[in-house]
Amino acid sequence: MFGMGFFEILVVLVVAIIFLGPEKFPQAVVDVVKFFRAVKKTLNDAKDTLDKEINIEEIKKETLEYQKLFEDKIEGLKGVRIEELEDAKIVAEKEIKSVQDLMQDYKQSLENNAPPKHLNKEVSNREVFHNEPPKEIELIANNNTTKHDKEKEHV
């Protein structure tokens, strides 16, 4: 204890008995033991508080890590949505170009009094077997209906 050997502790006890006397010595020992217990309790409380603070810091670090992970996932989802919109835009542009080509073909056929080129294409077996109209004809039919509706609005 405190770097003292058994002989040194014995010398301190003998000096304490001589200095304090046999009546005060037991009370002094009790007071010293209470003091060391209080110091030990205070140190343990400080240690527990420090452990709790360290635990709180670890929880804060974990929370920040989860928050960063969550934000990264949100950014990833935003990127997916933008990519999906760009893909949809490309598909829509292709469809618009296809419709414009069909309209151009239709206009040329009206000018030349010939059937449109897209009507000369063969219809697939699937469309005939399932009684489905060809897809390109559906687009023209929908387009004509839209034009007819627009003409009604102007009248």
Curated annotation (Swiss-Prot):
Q: Which residues cross the membrane?
A: 1-21
Q: Which InterPro entries match?
A: TatB
GO MF terms on file? protein transmembrane transporter activity
Q: Which GO terms describe its cellular component?
A: TAT protein transport complex
The annotated regions of Basic and acidic residues compositional bias extend over 119-138, 146-155
Q: What is its main location?
A: membrane
Give the UniProt family note: Belongs to the TatB family.
Write down what this protein is called.
Sec-independent protein translocase protein TatB
According to its UniProt entry, this protein's organism is: Helicobacter acinonychis (strain Sheeba)
